[in-house]
C-alpha cells in the first residue's frame, strides 16, 4: 500500500490525523522514504504538519489555503501531546455567542511547557496555567470530533485574568458585555480555586462601573465578600505605582 492509499483509507474512516511513527511502521516503508513522501504531501497540500511528527489530512474545503483550522484537530493533537486543554478566552466566548470580538487564531489554554507548534502552520494562540479545571469545561462536536471549552463562568474570569493577552481590559469588557447573560454569578465560586481574588475584584469592578450590571455585581459581591481578608488594594491595570492606590470602592480597585 502506498502512502497516498494509506491516507485515503484513514480519511474515509474518519481518522483525519496521524503520527509520523504510524507511517514509519507501514510494511515496506523506510524512515527516509516516509519522510520524503510526507514532505511531498505537505507541498501538495494533502496533509499539514501541525506539530513535529503529527499531521492532519487536509479535506477538500481547506485544500486551497493548505491550512486546517485548529478546531478540526485540536482534541487529537492534545491527546498526542498528552496535555489537558480547553478552547479559551475569545474563542470560548464566541462559542457562547459573544462573536463581535472573535479571535483570528483559535485560543487554547493548556499547561506549561509550551507545545512547539510551527508559527508558519500553527492556527493556535496558546495561553498557560498551572492546571486545567476539567470540572468547569464543556464539550461540543466539531467537524471531526469534539472540542473542550471553558464554561461561561470560567470564560468570564479568564477574560479578566488574561486581559493583556487578548488586548486589554477594554476588549475584555466588550466581550463580557455580550457574555454577561450566559454567566451564572452564583457559579463563580467554583472558579475561585483556579484564580486569584484580585481577578475577581477586577471582574466585579468592571461589572459594576464599566458595564453597569449592578444586579450581577451585587450578586458577585455576595458570593465573594465573606472572605475579604484575602482582598488587597489592586489596580485595574498595572500601569501606575501602587503607592497611588486608595480604597475608592467596595471592590478595592483603582483605575
What residue ranges belong to the model's regions?
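Short N-terminal helix-initiation segments at or just after the protein's N-terminus
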Residues: 17-22, 34-38, 94-101, 231-243
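Short beta-edge/loop segments at beta->alpha junctions of small alpha/beta modules
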Residues: 1-84, 181-201, 208
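Hydrophobic alpha-helical interaction segments
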Residues: 137-255
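Short charge-dense sequence patches
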Residues: 6-7, 38-48, 102-111, 120-128, ...
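Short gly/ser-rich loop at a beta-strand->alpha-helix junction or flexible surface loop bordering the NTP-binding
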Residues: 20, 49-61, 67-132
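A generic structural signal for short, non-catalytic loop/turn and secondary-structure boundary residues
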Residues: 11-13, 48, 82, 101, ...
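Short amphipathic alpha-helical segments with coiled-coil-like heptad repeat character
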Residues: 31-33, 100-102, 164-168
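A residue-level signal for conserved active-site and pocket-lining positions in enzyme catalytic cores
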Residues: 23, 92, 156
Amino acid at each position: 500500500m502506498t502512502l497516498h492509499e494509506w491516507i485515503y483509507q484513514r480519511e474515509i474512516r474518519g481518522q483525519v490525523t496521524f503520527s509520523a511513527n504510524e507511517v514509519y511502521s507501514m510494511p515496506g516503508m523506510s524512515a527516509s522514504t516516509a519522510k520524503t513522501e510526507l514532505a511531498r504531501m505537505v507541498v501538495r497540500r494533502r496533509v499539514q504538519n501541525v506539530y513535529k511528527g503529527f499531521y492532519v489530512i487536509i479535506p477538500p474545503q481547506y485544500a486551497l489555503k493548505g491550512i486546517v483550522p485548529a478546531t478540526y484537530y485540536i482534541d487529537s493533537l492534545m491527546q498526542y501531546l498528552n496535555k489537558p486543554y480547553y478552547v479559551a478566552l475569545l474563542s470560548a466566548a464566541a462559542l457562547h455567542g459573544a462573536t463581535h470580538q472573535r479571535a483570528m487564531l483559535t485560543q487554547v489554554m493548556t499547561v506549561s511547557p509550551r507545545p512547539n507548534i510551527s508559527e508558519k502552520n500553527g492556527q493556535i494562540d496558546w495561553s498557560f496555567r498551572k492546571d486545567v479545571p476539567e470540572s468547569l469545561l464543556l464539550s461540543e462536536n466539531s467537524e471531526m470530533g469534539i472540542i473542550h471549552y471553558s464554561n461561561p463562568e470560567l470564560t468570564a474570569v479568564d477574560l479578566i485574568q488574561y486581559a493583556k493577552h487578548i488586548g486589554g481590559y477594554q476588549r475584555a469588557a466588550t466581550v463580557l458585555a455580550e457574555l454577561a447573560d450566559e454567566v451564572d454569578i452564583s457559579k463563580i465560586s467554583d472558579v475561585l480555586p483556579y484564580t486569584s481574588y484580585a481577578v475577581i475584584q477586577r471582574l466585579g469592578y468592571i461589572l459594576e462601573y464599566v458595564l453597569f450590571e449592578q444586579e450581577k455585581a451585587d450578586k458577585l459581591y455576595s458570593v465573594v465578600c465573606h472572605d475579604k481578608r484575602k482582598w488587597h488594594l489592586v489596580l485595574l491595570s498595572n500601569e501606575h505605582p501602587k503607592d497611588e492606590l486608595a480604597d475608592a470602592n467596595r471592590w478595592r480597585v483603582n483605575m
